């Protein structure tokens, strides 16, 4: 049985990514998602990159997306010739993969397409594997990564690693020319250390030199999630709802590694001005 046939045989229900169907018998039917069988065929359509993109997107949000058959499809699709497919595959693998899949996403931080690099950085926020720390540090480095969105997401991904080299890299990145990166770095440092010293590199350096236990007050790490308020039409019965997520630990990160010290830690330091 071919790969596409196996995928079709294994699907059970795609629950999101509504699309408008022309010729549907009713307004509700017009917004039904493609069938699981069609989504699987789309995801493996070797002639149509747009179909592969849509198929992977549909499968990645289904309730069976974490099954090995589909995770393997997402892995293979990270090598697709089309950058859009690589990007959506990176997103799917980050959402449904295992800690070891971080090693698949890590090389994608060097992809020539910025959107692929962005999705790889976001995916690495959801997969915990210390082997990818050097790649994330490079993605945070202004001299090595030109896209500020990638640098910001890399900063947030690094916040799950309680290592001195990570703190050093984040403090250095406070000098980044992008305000968005500055705030992402600050948020990462707050999660790691429990301190809130603002955006001034010198203040963080002074504190870091003064402490022997930089991670004692850490708040613990949960990956950033998508959340938004309902739009007016989403209050209509049967309309698709926002794909809001619940914060959680990355795959491979133990709760023991993220909790405990914060319960008895001193209060966070007040923010200071200057940079």
Please report, for each region that a protein language model flagged, where it lies by residue.
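Core register positions within helices of long alpha-helical scaffolds
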Residues: 58, 92-95, 123-126, 157-161, ...
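Bacterial signal peptide processing site
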Residues: 13-18
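Pro/Ala/Gly-rich low-complexity, hydrophilic intrinsically disordered segments
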Residues: 197-243
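Bacterial N-terminal signal peptides
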Residues: 2-10
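Conserved hydrophobic register position within alpha-solenoid helical repeats
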Residues: 55, 89, 120, 154, ...
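Amphipathic alpha-helical scaffolding segments comprising HEAT/armadillo-like alpha-solenoid repeats
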Residues: 30-43, 64-79, 98-110, 129-142, ...
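Short inter-helical turns and helix N-cap capping residues of alpha-solenoid HEAT/ARM repeat scaffolds
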Residues: 47-48, 81-82, 112-113, 146-147, ...
